[in-house]
Design a protein with these regions (language model features):
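The Walker A/P-loop phosphate-binding site
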Residues: 2-106, 114-123
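P-loop NTPase motor core
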Residues: 63, 108-197
Length: 197
């Protein structure tokens, strides 16, 4: 049986630099206001990950995220809110424990806007980013080429455009999430009606 050291010694030195024993790898968790959810998640939402918070309309997804931001701020974490729904309410956020003077806020109307803002926030060292909600983001197919001008509706019918753009978005965001100082990204999404029989 080959040992770890023997296996690593057989590898190319460039690859060997990136490998090692799987010890000392720890995940930090951000507690939520829900003890039950924290227990189910092993301590809360994990840093260094992308979390999808999905549910029906008005099921307190945004409120849970705002309360989680408030808890993170009390731990000294820098937080951001990317608003695609245009539904952020400063007064409500403050009632839920958010220090809004220390919360970075940005609007995002398209998937491209969201990626640009989120990647910039990750590079700036923001600890926790909430995107509310990915269901409201327009895919690139809705815009004229290299423009923010919307196309006519009849030229936007491309099956899977939103899914395709979001897939690429999450790949870029995952790559930008620095594992030396991992951030937590929470994306909110809404359940849609099933239109099939």
């Amino acid at each position: 049986m080959t040992t770890i050291d023997e296996a690593l010694a057989m590898l190319d030195p460039k690859i060997r630099k990136r490998l090692g024993p799987a010890v000392g790898i720890k995940t930090e968790f951000q507690p939520t206001p829900s003890p039950g959810l924290n227990a189910a998640l092993g301590g809360g939402f994990p840093y260094g990950r992308q979390v999808l918070l999905w549910g029906s309309k008005s099921s307190a997804k945004s409120s849970l995220c705002l309360q989680t931001i408030g808890l993170a701020q009390k731990e000294g974490k820098l937080c951001a809110w990317v608003d695609a729904e245009m539904s952020y309410d400063q007064e409500w956020a403050e009632k839920l424990g958010v220090d809004t003077s220390q919360l970075i806020y940005s609007e995002a109307r398209s998937v491209n806007d969201m990626v640009d803002v989120t990647v910039a926030l990750l590079h700036a060292g923001v600890d926790l980013i909430v995107i509310d909600s990915i269901s409201s983001l327009l895919p690139a197919v809705y815009f004229e080429k290299d423009s923010t001008e919307l196309k006519d509706l009849d030229r936007t019918k491309q099956i899977g455009a939103e899914s395709k753009d979001l897939k690429h978005a999450w790949m870029m965001i995952n790559y930008a999430n620095n594992q030396e100082k991992p951030s937590l990204i929470i994306a909110i999404s809404q359940a849609r009606n099933n239109i099939t029989p």
